[in-house]
């Protein structure tokens, strides 16, 4: 996948490659592979084992080991701490101190108050670490807190709208930002409906409707979403001004 992406982009855009593994040694292998394959940065996912609890030293060691094998910038994926995989702010700050190649976090903490606290803590450091929002279900609200960008799965469908929204917020053009948000809202409502696990399946169906994918394929145990839901996605794309009625 990385090789295909690299060949298609031909250096026009940076490539962020995800690193997800339950063990740090496997994470190191993936990081090396991504580095050698031409990635520009690495997005480090938290292991699922953290749902059973984590020590700060465990979380930091996992990231430190990845940084041992590559000098690529690291983006730490911050999950919701309530689920166990997210890092307490104190752990996150220690991690940033001890791993100097951390350049940003992808913030999915799921809490506006915590998101605000993280932005202030990370932006205010002598070596600022950027906060990239992935609160795609409430993107407008998250960006106005002071995020330095966004890293969102729904960018596969609405990257242009997301970029316009970010620029409007950066320019403090509230009226324009609200206007763009009104379009983004329709897609967020269908992409991030229950069950949440189907969000990427829905985005694939949207890309088919937009003529950007020939078909939407899912891997078991995921299943194709029903026709009625695909129709709701079609109506949302129309409401967002992305598809003709």
What residue spans do the PLM features occupy?
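Alpha-helical scaffolding segments of alpha/beta enzyme cores, especially the outer helices
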Residues: 1-7, 29-37, 58-69, 90-97, ...
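Short helix-capping segments at alpha-helix termini
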Residues: 7-13, 37-38, 70-72, 97-101, ...
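Active-site beta->alpha loop and helix N-cap motifs at the rims of alpha/beta catalytic domains
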Residues: 1-86, 223
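Catalytic alpha/beta core domains of metabolic enzymes, predominantly
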Residues: 65-68, 80-188, 192-195
